[in-house]
Amino acid sequence: MYKRQVQIRDAVSVPVIVKETGCGIAAEQYELLLEQGFTAFDCAGAGGTNFPAIEAKRQGVELTEEFAAWGVPTCWSLLDAQQTLPQNALLLASGGIRSAGDAARAFALGADAVGITAPLLCLVMEQGIDAAADYVEALAEELQKYMLLLGCLTPKELRDVPLIVTGETRDFIASRGYELAKLCRWRRG
């Protein structure tokens, strides 16, 4: 498994980031990728751009709503990463990140960086590159406000903010056997 990815990694002289395409990376996949020597990941969870749906549309294939929603949500993929990845792994969060609040939550869950695609592409297509640049600037300013309210100077410090977890995410944590209280107090790094 992951033979082609290993070949690519071994053939290039730059770091390789393993990126999911809208379905998230679960703990089991993180473990397999770690065994192959990968240390950088973009979880690209369900909730953002769904590449299987894009490919199906391109091929003229109809997807059921259930299949189109398939995947591990970004939040859950980040929680799996916390429990699986070593401290020195690079973890990027994308998939459904649309606001500064989404970005702050991703940083709080251990992401080293976040990726935002759909809102930017829509702005570029509908209003031009300047509108997209304004969006990024406003997002950065709003993220700074979240950090100020939480007493953080950097996005990485958001990992130290205690979490409150409810609903399906709390159920996910329990189903994985993760220790909720510990997870809410400490995240990667």
Task: For the regions a language model picked out, list residue spans one by one.
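Structural motif
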Residues: 11, 36, 109-110
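Internal active-site segments that recognize and position negatively charged phosphoryl groups
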Residues: 6-32
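Glycine-rich beta-to-alpha transition loops that act as phosphate-gripper elements at the mouths
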Residues: 17-25, 90-101
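Short, ordered loop/turn segments at secondary-structure junctions
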Residues: 21, 45-48, 118-120, 151
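Short, small-residue-biased leader/transition segments that mark boundaries at the very start
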Residues: 1-2
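Structural preference for beta-strand elements that scaffold enzyme active sites
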Residues: 15-17, 40-42, 90-92, 113-115
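Alpha/beta catalytic cores of nucleotide-metabolism and tRNA/nucleoside-modifying enzymes
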Residues: 65-89, 98-189
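Catalytic core of soluble alpha/beta enzymes
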Residues: 27-80, 84
